[in-house]
């Protein structure tokens, strides 16, 4: 292999080409590759961060859901207790009202009973007076007074 001027020219041209490439082409190409590598690394880091945030959000949502269920259970239990209290209060009020009505009815019955006794007493007095006057008027005849007394007893 002979080294001649053409080969030396090609070597010089190639060296200039390599120098030009290293000076002007390689830095932007290397910069583009570095930016691409950084973007990929940033994208992976972002995806990893998003994955962790998603996991945290899932845990938080599960905790919030658990708290909401506990609160709902508590609300239902409180509502049940309140309803039971209202039911008991209504029963107590109904019993009190029934007792009051019963007491009033008993009092009214007692008043009617006293009134009826008074009327009966008054009627008995009137009948006794009538019988006594008939007995006095008919005291001469024993049969007549016996009949008057029997009539009186039948009326009573």
From Swiss-Prot:
Keywords: ATP synthesis, Cell inner membrane, Cell membrane, CF(0), Hydrogen ion transport, Ion transport, Membrane, Transmembrane, Transmembrane helix, Transport. Disulfide bonds: none annotated. F-type ATPases have 2 components, F(1) - the catalytic core - and F(0) - the membrane proton channel. F(1) has five subunits: alpha(3), beta(3), gamma(1), delta(1), epsilon(1). F(0) has three main subunits: a(1), b(2) and c(10-14). The alpha and beta chains form an alternating ring which encloses part of the gamma chain. F(1) is attached to F(0) by a central stalk formed by the gamma and epsilon chains, while a peripheral stalk is formed by the delta and b chains. This is ATP synthase subunit b. GO terms for cellular component: plasma membrane; proton-transporting ATP synthase complex. It comes from the Bacteria. InterPro entries: ATP_synth_B-like_membr_sf (IPR028987), ATP_synth_b/b'su_bac/chlpt (IPR002146), ATP_synth_F0_bsu_bac (IPR005864), ATP_synthase_B_chain (IPR050059). The chain crosses the membrane at residues 5-27. It is a single-pass membrane protein. The keyword Iron does not apply. Its main location: membrane. It is found in: Cell inner membrane. GO terms for molecular function: proton-transporting ATP synthase activity, rotational mechanism; proton-transporting ATPase activity, rotational mechanism. It holds the Pfam family ATP-synt_B. SUPFAM superfamilies: F1F0 ATP synthase subunit B, membrane domain. Belongs to the ATPase B chain family. It comes from Francisella tularensis subsp. holarctica (strain LVS). F(1)F(0) ATP synthase produces ATP from ADP in the presence of a proton or sodium gradient. F-type ATPases consist of two structural domains, F(1) containing the extramembraneous catalytic core and F(0) containing the membrane proton channel, linked together by a central stalk and a peripheral stalk. During catalysis, ATP synthesis in the catalytic domain of F(1) is coupled via a rotary mechanism of the central stalk subunits to proton translocation. Component of the F(0) channel, it forms part of the peripheral stalk, linking F(1) to F(0).
């Amino acid at each position: 292999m002979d080294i001649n001027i053409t080969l030396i020219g090609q070597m010089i041209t190639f060296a200039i080409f390599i120098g030009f490439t290293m000076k002007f082409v390689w830095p932007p190409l290397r910069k583009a590759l570095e930016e691409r590598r950084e973007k990929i690394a940033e994208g992976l880091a972002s995806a990893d961060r998003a994955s962790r945030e998603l996991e945290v959000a899932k845990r938080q949502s599960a905790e919030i859901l658990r708290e909401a269920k506990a609160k709902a259970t508590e609300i239902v239990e409180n509502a049940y207790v309140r309803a039971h209290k209202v039911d008991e209060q209504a029963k107590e009020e109904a019993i009190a009202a029934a007792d009051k009505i019963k007491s009033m009815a008993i009092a009214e019955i007692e008043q009617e009973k006293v009134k009826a006794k008074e009327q009966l007493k008054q009627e008995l007095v009137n009948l006794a007076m009538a019988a006594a006057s008939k007995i006095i008027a008919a005291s001469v005849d024993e049969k007549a007074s016996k009949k008057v007394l029997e009539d009186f007893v039948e009326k009573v």
